[in-house]
């Protein structure tokens, strides 16, 4: 649902409607003879910006808090890398740019539902199904914050329905790799709170049988334990 904005004056990008022609949408207005000035506001992106206030791993002691925005960015970068690995090395058909954008939206419904801890989310089939239903309602609520034309474009990214089975698997692997990296960082800082979570993420990734993730773990993951000097050193 668009928000209300009372336009102080007629300016560029201001939409004019005759009185009463609002088509059911709320809008701000300034009387000007027989016309009213309507400026439609859509809060979708402002709501997305709130991801930075949602803290992940909320039931665990962390040496450094991780926001949903950070996780989303990391997942998008990892998803893009996995897709490039797929195209160059493993031959898995995928669209790197499409998967990367889908990754940017993959946890957006948590702005409304909150980041429910994994042990709670998957405690039972009842809870899991209820949470999935909440996610669907969240997507519907969020897309309603856009014009219909834009909502049609964004909705498939929020739901992931535009992805193929192979692309969905790559995105899920990237999501798990982001969690794995977080666990490694916490463990490296001496925080044993994440030991079990680290083992769990490794087991899940292994069970996925994702060759792109396996390639990344073999060739890229060890670099996450290096310091800045080691990362930027140029041999030879």
Predicted segments, located by residue:
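Short, linear, compositionally biased motifs with a strong N-terminal bias
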Residues: 19-20, 234
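Polybasic, lysine-rich low-complexity intrinsically disordered segments
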Residues: 11-13, 32-33
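N-terminal amphipathic/hydrophobic targeting modules at extreme N-termini
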Residues: 13-16, 23
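Alpha-helical, largely C-terminal catalytic domains
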Residues: 30-236
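Intrinsically disordered, low-complexity segments enriched in serine/proline and basic residues
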Residues: 2, 16-18
